[in-house]
Amino acid sequence: MLAYYVERFTTVEINATFYRMPSEKTVAGWGAAAPAGFTYVLKAPQRITHFARLRGVDEPLRYFCDAARTLGDRLGPLLFQLPPNFKKATDRLGEVLALVPDEFRVAFEFRHESWFDDEVYALLRSRNAALCVADTEEGATPAVATADFGYLRLRAVEYSDEDLRRWIETIDRLGAGWRDAFV
């Protein structure tokens, strides 16, 4: 499956890392399987985002970052997708942002509406962390730029041409200061 992706796309979001903490050997293998210029986005393990809910995650986060680091220039952002019932906890978000080494770009997908406020946006901006703009069955999250790159997850089954035009307009509007956009 990976061979199929690297032939057709320039970026892939790895969801397997959400279900199982990857080893350095596994991640290095992914890097070796991709051509120059290919980018991987790794989704943070549920152990960090769902089970621990960003609390006391020093050790698993360090392990995850060490594994991710083996991708070198093929590494894109690390995506932290929080559970829908996880309400705003800026203290925990701040701790995780401080723990992730500055060499990593990070994006956060918040799925509880309490996260969508200026305090959270300011905290993300302070670390150049992207607010993931997600389009789901429940609706779209606020389109707010908080980093010098964008991260959008379009997860509907189908998009009409008009839907895609609206997303292109959103990306154009938000992306004036972006170096990259991951869609």
Q: Model-found features: residue ranges?
A:
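Residues lining hydrophobic/aromatic ligand-binding pockets adjacent to catalytic sites
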Residues: 1-182
